[in-house]
Amino acid sequence: MTLIHMNILMAFSMSLMGLLMYRSHLMSALLCLEGMMLSLFVLAALTILSSHFTLANMMPIILLVFAACEAAIGLALLVMVSNTYGTDYVQNLNLLQC
């Protein structure tokens, strides 16, 4: 495993640890999810480039599309929760209150 792959896996694991530790605020959880998606994108792009697997060239682009959709839905949820409750606590996202 090369140093680049180790750094990408370290970035993914740091984002995952951030998501597990700082899960009280929705904004920090969204930032950690974006870090995870970015590291997955770079890992997928490097893996496809190094293996010369031409059939999977669209996989990083599709991953970016899903990351953009996740970011848009997350920001819409953040705005809705902030307008309703005044804070961005994840505790306010109880599905039984809807």
From Swiss-Prot:
It comes from the Eukaryota. One of its GO terms (molecular function) is NADH dehydrogenase (ubiquinone) activity. It catalyses: a ubiquinone + NADH + 5 H(+)(in) = a ubiquinol + NAD(+) + 4 H(+)(out). Its EC number is 7.1.1.2. It is an enzyme of class 7 (translocase). Belongs to the complex I subunit 4L family. Core subunit of the mitochondrial membrane respiratory chain NADH dehydrogenase (Complex I) which catalyzes electron transfer from NADH through the respiratory chain, using ubiquinone as an electron acceptor. Part of the enzyme membrane arm which is embedded in the lipid bilayer and involved in proton translocation. This is NADH-ubiquinone oxidoreductase chain 4L. It comes from Balaenoptera physalus (Fin whale). The lineage of its organism: Eukaryota, Metazoa, Chordata, Craniata, Vertebrata. The gene is MT-ND4L.
